[in-house]
């Protein structure tokens, strides 16, 4: 999980989701997991 100021999709499989007011990216590739900090 990477904590970033700006999150974006890295590949086509990445999904942007809003959870508890935070934007997170989930993907089948674990390296693409991100969260806005």
UniProtKB/Swiss-Prot annotation:
GO BP terms, alphabetized: translation
Record SUPFAM superfamilies: Ribosomal protein L36 (SSF57840)
Membrane-spanning segments: none
PROSITE patterns hit by this protein: RIBOSOMAL_L36 (PS00828)
Principal cellular location given in the protein's record: plastid
Superkingdom in the source lineage: Eukaryota
Record's subcellular location: Plastid, Chloroplast
Gene Ontology molecular functions: structural constituent of ribosome
Keywords per UniProt: Chloroplast, Plastid, Ribonucleoprotein, Ribosomal protein
Matching Pfam families: Ribosomal_L36
GO cellular component annotations of the record: chloroplast; ribonucleoprotein complex; ribosome
Family: Belongs to the bacterial ribosomal protein bL36 family.
Protein name: Large ribosomal subunit protein bL36c
């Amino acid at each position: 999980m990477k904590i970033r100021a700006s999150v974006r999709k890295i590949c086509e499989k990445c999904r942007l989701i809003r959870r508890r007011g935070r934007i997170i990216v989930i993907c089948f590739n674990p390296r693409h997991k991100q969260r806005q900090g």
